[in-house]
């Protein structure tokens, strides 16, 4: 998807390809390690890059396109439409309200989307998990404690993730916190949580935190992703917990699919009904793939007994057998190298659903080659 958008080379230069992925007990003891999980030799290898840096890269590319304008400081108040156009009512810095009109409005305004609320009110089908997650970016020498680039720590009470973010030693540590805790309580308890969870049991002077962000975990989807000339995509359309990275990936897939539909309409190769297909397909992918897979990933980390997980969890058992079974390893590399598929890792060679979908197949003159 990033290659198609023309930004992959910049992303690769700014980020890095991670090496090993380890599943561990809460105290850091390894359970199983997947070496070179990216895999590094694939042209579609996993690349790690902080989201704020990715945003800057995308913004710089947008500025080079004469057909794109970026307006800062605009708060969406409402949306509307008639048979010929759609519009967004925004409040600019200073309080001035303005109407921005176009052929279509695409609401990509995040989990608290005002576009979605204008269409459906407070309706957002799904659930919120009991636990909350506290995401932090921190400088701490995890390498000295034998941690890999990606570490998933399994425990019903102390589940957390430790992942290298940058080449200069910045790490993401995200950990469980009681969902009933207030922001003040989360911040007050944070030093004790770090001392308990991190290797070496550090004190605040032993690490440098750049930011700390508690947030709730959700599994939710809007009733529709298309209402007339107004469409929803990414977090504005659906939410999932972060285990597996399906939120950001699904958002990219939405953007690719919606752009194909709008390009088809613009080129005269599709009518507006292709947007109904976008709504139908993307919602089906959320409910049939993103929601169950991300839920399964979260349950594996948050409810499993780390002492028995290799015996009871077929996915973890498969990971463990990779060291001895070259066929499983080959299947894993093949799947991870393919940009369009995900698999049930309990049987790595089985494709269960594609998170991408080619909407150019619905063009009236046959399958086209639409580009972003």
Swiss-Prot record:
It is an enzyme of class 1 (oxidoreductase). Its cofactor is FAD. InterPro entries: FAD-bd (IPR002938), FAD/NAD-bd_sf (IPR036188), RIFMO-like (IPR050641). The keyword Oxidoreductase applies. Disruption phenotype: Impairs the production of terrein. FAD binds at residues 76, 172-174, 215, 235. One of its GO terms (molecular function) is oxidoreductase activity, acting on paired donors, with incorporation or reduction of molecular oxygen, NAD(P)H as one donor, and incorporation of one atom of oxygen. Terrein shows anticancer activity on various tumors including cervical carcinoma, ovarian cancer, and head and neck cancer. The secondary metabolite acts as angiogenesis inhibitors through the inhibition of angiogenin secretion. Terrein also has anti-inflammatory activity. It shows an alleviative function of age-related inflammation characterized as an anti-oxidant and might therefore be a useful nutraceutical compound for anti-aging. Terrein may enhance osseointegration by decreasing the level of ROS and has a potentially synergistic effect on osteoblast differentiation. Pathway: Secondary metabolite biosynthesis. Belongs to the PheA/TfdB FAD monooxygenase family. This is FAD-dependent monooxygenase terC.
